[in-house]
Amino acid sequence: MQKEAVGCQTSLHNINQEDITVLTSKMIKDAAIAAGADKCGIAPMSRFKGAPDEMNPQFLFPEAKSCIGFVFRIPRGVQRGIEEGTQFYQYPSMAYGGINEIFAPAVLYQVGKLIEDEGYEAFVYRNTGARGVVSDMDGSPGNTLSPEEQIEINENAKTSTAHHRSVQFTRPTREGNVAPDLQFQFRLAAVACGLGEIGWSKMLLTPEFGPLQRVAFLFTDAELEYDEMYHGKPLCRKCGACVRECPGSCIPAIHSGKTISVDLDGKLCEWGDIDMWRCYAFYTHAGRFYNPFVPKEVWDANENGALDLMEGVTDVANEQEIMKVYTALQKYFPSWVGYNMAKCGGCIRACVSMLEKKGGCMEGRFEAPLRTKKAWKLDR
């Protein structure tokens, strides 16, 4: 046994140094693109310093040195059915479910294998929701309903909580830890990785795709070459198109003073203080004038005030009002996609339409613009 060990040691000394690979940022980015990502950026973990503990990814993997962000484009054509008012299934199915559940995890898996083959750990983090110790919607303590987990709430076997769990409870596993499952702000993490900026509508904007993408992340203890945060021409034009075309008036006016500001390692990120609960209701159910699946009579009747939020009877937008809306309207959507029932996309389509105009980051990307006629609105 001793001789074998010596022999092994000798052979290691004889290895050609050129055969030893060193994990690089380029290797990771090349692997990400080859696996199907559209863009990849890398940030040092130090950029997350100062984030609230319950949303700080540094707690996920304390030894991690690098955060790797991946962009997955939403094909503009996925929005075409809603833009024309003729097909509403493809957007939630492909742009939400397809990317978050299939395409992104596959890339995380492949890039993670590359990193671990080089001797470093790969902590993959796909999109999820309704798992943290604070609300996805307003950041308040405790779990609340989340559109990322909204699936057949009345028919699901575990409907006793918004989580689809029988009991909502979580606690730190050791002193100094945060309670599981820790979630962080994906869009700010993407900014940290140099992938883009936050627009007024709180959407992540990238120079290549405007608002048309989703993201996923990977954390590793490998020290890599890092990307600078975006510092080019502002991607958001502050044009107010997203404000005007939101059917629920969820986005404040540009000059309203209603803003959220975050200092991300010296970069100021600012967006409109969106009414997230109201947005939840309208982006999944669109409202009287933009949901062709719900009969006019249902809106008119507004039984038991279930649609007060959608009809403007109340300004109160919270979890209870959302549940009323879902209970009243979910049966009118023809089929589920195993994900939330996004039917709006008003802010995204408005943003694309403006960014495709002269001076926008999407100018010249397509032969023809997304919007070729006046946006539709039901007459009722």
What residue ranges belong to the model's regions?
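Acidic, Ala/Val/Gly-enriched low-complexity intrinsically disordered segments
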Residues: 4-6
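Short alpha-helix boundary/capping motifs
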Residues: 60-61, 143, 375-380
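C-terminal, charged low-complexity interaction regions
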Residues: 79-83, 91-92, 358-380
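Non-catalytic, usually N-terminal nucleic-acid engagement modules in DNA/RNA processing proteins
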Residues: 8, 12-111, 144
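Catalytic cores of enzyme domains
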Residues: 51, 97-356, 363-372
